[in-house]
A protein has these predicted regions:
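Donor-binding/catalytic cores of nucleotide-activated saccharide
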Residues: 75, 99-209, 221, 225-233
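A conserved acidic beta->alpha catalytic loop
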Residues: 27, 43-52, 74
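Glycine-rich, basic loop-to-helix element that forms the pyrophosphate-binding segment
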Residues: 70-86
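Short beta-strand/loop segment that forms part of the nucleotide-sugar
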Residues: 36-45, 66-71, 96
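Membrane-interface aromatic/basic loop that binds lipid-linked glycans or pyrophosphate carriers
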Residues: 282-344
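Nucleotide-sugar-dependent glycosyltransferase catalytic core
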Residues: 191, 208-243, 283-290
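Short, well-formed alpha-helical segments that are part of the catalytic scaffolds
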Residues: 17-30
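Short aromatic/hydrophobic "clamp" motif used to bind/position activated sugar donors
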Residues: 91
Length: 344
């Protein structure tokens, strides 16, 4: 496969991120050799100094950093723009308030350069990520040691068992750029939680992957108004439903893809469906209880097989307990998980 000049493109969707962008971009430029790294800062119609800061980085690092300005399209629209503009053989999305670990960056670049020079480069690299929550001393590191053997070329059928709360999020993913484009993924604009789609729709086009057991990505939690705060997610349950609908329609039938891929996609779809259900229940709003029912009815109408397989999952069964008892179980279960994991 022909070697491109850029090994890795980082896409940074940025809206009003003037206070955080310097930390993010600086971490991406901490590599010993940045010649084959590309950093695209997609300013999504910011109202602060985000664009000006991105342009300063572009002037300071010509040929490496590029500032892209667009009218506001939301997180998904900014990711779409970045992927379309990417020149790297591989692409990774880094939110502007997050950052990467410098030592892990060196390891990642070593692996990707080797793959870029090979005749059959992997389609996806999976790395660990850290929930970096404000005020929490012990940071929760998400790894995939139980499901993936580190350092080896893997296919979907080589993967082990993913536990109830184990899944591959955007923070863990580096895709081969061509794979994302071939998948035809276009994230919904002006919609939150499209990260679920990003870590799902391209997977049927991924044939080979590697797992690097290093804490590459730091996921910052604690910024006011952040989309993963409980009250915010409750207000945005309609967007969680939209994301669920997109994921359902990106799910292949079981006889069209490797067994390992189908099992994982059902596992992750069950988790997203469960997350959406949790926040509909946490709202204590009867209208949202009805929306929860409508969401599950939509899955069943689209594919009875996918619906049956998703409902088999333990978390999904628990979330579909009827009446006030079921709602009580979910409310209590969420807050226990929140305390242990530091998700929110």
């Amino acid at each position: 496969m022909a070697r491109t000049a850029k090994t890795l493109t980082f896409v940074i969707p940025a809206y009003n991120m003037e206070s955080y962008l310097d930390r993010c971009v600086s971490s991406l430029l901490s590599a010993t050799n940045t010649d084959d790294i590309e950093v695209l800062v997609v300013d999504d119609g910011s109202q602060d100094g985000t664009l000006e800061m991105a342009q300063k980085f572009e002037a300071r690092y010509p040929g490496i950093v590029r500032a892209i300005h667009q009218e506001n399209k939301g997180h998904g629209g900014a990711v779409n723009t970045g992927i379309a503009a990417a020149n790297g053989m591989y692409v990774k999305v880094v939110d502007a308030d997050d950052w990467v670990d410098p030592e892990s960056l060196e390891q990642v670049m070593t692996v990707l350069r080797e793959e870029a020079d090979s005749t059959e480069p992997i389609d996806m690299l999976v790395t660990n990520y850290v929930y970096d929550k404000v005020g929490k001393r012990n940071k929760h590191v998400v790894n995939f040691r139980h499901a993936m053997k580190a350092g080896e070329r893997l296919t979907w059928n080589d993967l082990g068992h993913f536990g109830l709360a184990e899944y591959i999020l955007m923070h863990a993913l580096t895709y081969r750029t061509a794979v994302v484009r071939e998948s035809g993924m276009q994230l919904p604009e002006h919609t939150f939680y499209v990260d679920f789609i990003y870590a799902y729709q391209p997977f049927p086009w991924v044939k080979t992957m590697k797992y690097l057991d290093t804490p590459f990505y730091h996921y910052f939690i604690g910024r006011d108004g952040q989309s993963v705060q409980t009250d915010v997610m409750i207000r945005r349950v309609d967007q969680l439903r939209l994301v669920n609908r997109c994921m359902v329609r990106a799910t292949p039938e079981c006889d069209t893809v490797p067994d390992g891929l189908y099992r994982y996609m059902i596992h992750f779809l069950a988790i997203e469906s469960s997350v959406a259900s949790v926040f509909m229940i946490l709202s204590r709003d009867p209208e949202n209880y009805e929306k929860k029912k409508d969401m599950w009815d939509d899955i069943k109408a689209y594919s009875p097989t996918i619906y049956k397989d998703v409902r088999k999952k333990a978390m999904s069964r628990a979330l579909n307990l009827r009446g006030s008892i079921g709602r009580f179980v979910i409310r209590k279960g969420y807050f226990v998980a929140e305390h242990v994991v530091g998700f929110n």
